[in-house]
Amino acid sequence: MSEKIWISVCEYQDLLPDTGLCALVNKQQVALFNSRRLNEVFAVSNFDPIGEANVLSRGILGSIGDEIVVASPLYKQHFNLRTGECLEKPEYNIAVYPVRVEDGLVQVLV
């Protein structure tokens, strides 16, 4: 098994608050979100398993109760950005990646 490494994907200033950005990381599309309210960056798979398309980076960032979510632009289902679970259909989930900001760069652990 290969060791995981932190990969720089963009500058933090390129990740606008409350919007998504898609990056290709090790041949995987990763959706990045910068929550202004939480002052936190999230990284999840860009693939919507219900709509079967790489679109989550175009989704709407928000919250339901205490959960930070992204609403898919296709069928509007909500995915928890911390756990990857779909709130409406828990049998579906998306990959969640560790993410950090180091020296002004957004990095994903893959």
Q: PLM features: what roles do these ranges have?
A:
Residues M1-E67, N93-V110:
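N-terminal pre-ligand scaffold of iron-sulfur
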Residues K76-P98:
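C-terminal structural segments of small proteins and small subunits
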Residues D48, S72-Y75:
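Short cysteine clusters
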